[in-house]
């Protein structure tokens, strides 16, 4: 219950101890709580303070499956069963070069990659309205960038005592201490998805299950088919095979997922040199705009189980409105509210992004 601040006055530690007790009492019966971080986050505190915080958690939650953690380089780390660090499996990534195979490790937060802590420029921080190229870079950065950095693929290549990590952060939000919002979310502040959302969605199992949330196979084309779009087409999918078609009855490209035991379940798929705006222009001049498309088909056991089709947005002619309620209806109690999303679209409903 604190961040980057320590005071040597005894009263400060006593108040923190009280906060820790109240924190555990408040949340100890929540089924989603797996691990406690009772220490002051990113703070240079004394050794005896760390020992006391661990003891307080154990007192308030005296059960065998009570786990507490702190940073692997912090004072008093020897008192904690879980240590926070970044993967260091290859000796290059930012992590603990002296990782002990007898200790459980966890990456408390990963993903951010700022140039400095004043400017806050980062390939992870991308506003949704910046368009497809920045969003593609963000998704690639989170998945498996060309440079050495903690990413989803790296977390899948750790020894088994490194049990995972948490992305920073799920949604864009205001922070208060910087003029820019934090743009590192998989969705924007209005919970509208960026490409990174679909990249992570592709990591789920393709098996269809009876659950309260969406399951099963998926495929998504991260390409807007604009005059500024890349010739390379990026696709996210959890299927065994993806078939991409450019133009109706046109060129077909095929991707087969590699059979590997290491790394992220569904790597980012790139179909090189597929899209050509000049072909779009040629077909449009022939009044054949309906034949200009990208069609992705996800296959499992040779059968198509998921599809996604993208068309270029033409002349803007209407507004689309939809309720973003995730299937939960409004309750007329005077306090409920819901998000209504508005979009500019052509006559066929293709949203005009640029």
Feature map (PLM): residue ranges:
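Aromatic sugar-binding surface patches on proteins
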Residues: 261-282
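Substrate-binding/catalytic cleft of secreted carbohydrate-active enzymes
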Residues: 1-196, 213-223
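Non-catalytic, glycine-rich low-complexity segments
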Residues: 169, 181-234, 238-239, 310, ...
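Edge beta-strands of extracellular beta-sandwich domains
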Residues: 302-314
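Beta-strand-rich binding/interaction modules
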Residues: 230-256, 293-298, 354
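Beta-strand-rich structural segments
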Residues: 235-237, 336-353
């Amino acid at each position: 219950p604190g961040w980057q601040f320590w005071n040597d006055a005894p009263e400060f530690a006593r108040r923190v101890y009280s906060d820790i007790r109240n924190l555990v009492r408040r949340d100890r019966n929540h089924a989603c709580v797996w691990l406690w971080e009772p220490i002051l986050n990113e703070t240079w505190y004394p050794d005896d303070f760390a020992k006391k915080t661990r003891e307080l958690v154990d007192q308030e939650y005296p059960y065998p499956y009570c786990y507490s953690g702190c940073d692997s380089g912090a004072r008093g780390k020897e008192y904690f069963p879980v240590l926070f660090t970044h993967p260091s499996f290859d000796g290059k990534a930012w992590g603990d070069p002296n990782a002990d195979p007898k200790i459980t490790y966890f990456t408390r937060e990963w993903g951010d990659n700022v140039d400095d802590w004043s400017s806050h420029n980062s390939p992870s921080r991308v506003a949704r309205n910046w368009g497809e190229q920045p969003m593609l870079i963000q998704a690639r950065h989170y998945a498996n960038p060309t440079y050495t950095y903690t990413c989803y693929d790296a977390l899948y290549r750790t020894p088994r005592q490194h049990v995972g990590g948490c992305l920073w952060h799920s949604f864009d939000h205001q922070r208060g201490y910087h003029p820019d919002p934090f743009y590192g979310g998989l969705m924007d502040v209005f919970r509208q998805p960026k490409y990174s959302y679909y990249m992570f969605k592709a990591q789920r199992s393709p098996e269809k299950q009876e659950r309260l949330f969406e399951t099963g196979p998926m495929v998504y084309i991260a390409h807007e088919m604009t005059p500024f779009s890349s010739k390379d087409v990026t696709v996210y999918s959890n299927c065994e095979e993806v078939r991409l078609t450019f133009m109706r009855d046109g060129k077909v490209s095929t991707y087969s997922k590699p059979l590997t035991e290491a790394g992220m379940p569904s790597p980012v798929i790139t179909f090189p040199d597929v899209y050509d705006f000049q072909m779009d222009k040629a077909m449009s001049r022939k009044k054949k705009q309906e034949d200009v498309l990208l069609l992705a088909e996800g296959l499992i056991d040779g059968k198509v189980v998921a599809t996604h089709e993208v068309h270029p947005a033409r002349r803007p002619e209407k507004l689309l409105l939809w309720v973003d309620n995730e299937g939960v209806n409004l309750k007329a109690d005077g306090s409920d509210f819901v998000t209504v999303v508005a979009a500019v679209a052509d006559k066929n409903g293709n949203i005009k992004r640029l």
